[in-house]
Regions:
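Extended macromolecule-engaging scaffold surfaces
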Residues: 1-164
Length: 164
């Protein structure tokens, strides 16, 4: 009861998928997509993917990948105690959307979640929208570096708490 099945021929033969309709209410997530950024970062998607891949090699299972947001770059770093450390900086355009001191100067990401979000983008540039430490970050693609963020794919990542 409540099952739906799909079947089709593909390059690797016949594919079948069955799914079940769940009752209940889906969590309300629409408000997460309407983040009013206090600070945003734009960078090349491929550079960021490669940098995240290299730096996260030393991150342990629950260790956040730290993104330090500077005026014209972001620095990614990860460490495993005193045993291994990695850091790398890439060029970025950082925009403050509020007057005064930036509300967020560093963000902690789960390296796997960040890699998944970046890997799903099919645009040459990525746009991060930050609100405050510990609040969700919206990741979107950019076809033109100075253009508007794409709205066909949006990825929300909850930031991790960074150790002092």
């Amino acid at each position: 009861e409540g099952l739906v099945g799909f079947e089709g021929d593909g390059a690797n033969g016949v594919r079948r998928m069955t799914t079940r309709l769940l009752s209940g209410e889906f969590p309300k997530v629409r408000h997460l997509m309407d983040i009013k950024a206090t600070r945003s970062v734009r960078a090349r998607t491929d550079e960021l993917i490669n940098s995240v891949r290299r730096v996260s090699l030393v991150a342990e299972r629950n260790t956040p990948l730290r993104m330090v947001i500077n005026d014209d770059s972001v620095a990614l770093s990860a460490a495993t105690g005193d045993q291994a450390q990695a850091s790398e900086a890439i060029e970025a355009v950082v925009t403050n959307h509020v007057d005064g001191e930036p509300t967020i100067t560093a963000a902690g990401f789960n390296p796997h979640y960040l890699s998944d979000a970046l890997g799903a983008l099919d645009t040459p540039y990525v746009h991060f929208s930050f609100t405050a430490p510990g609040k969700p970050c919206l990741v979107t693609g950019l076809n033109d570096f100075d253009g508007k963020p794409e709205t066909d794919y949006r990825h929300v990542i909850m930031l991790m708490r960074l150790p002092s």
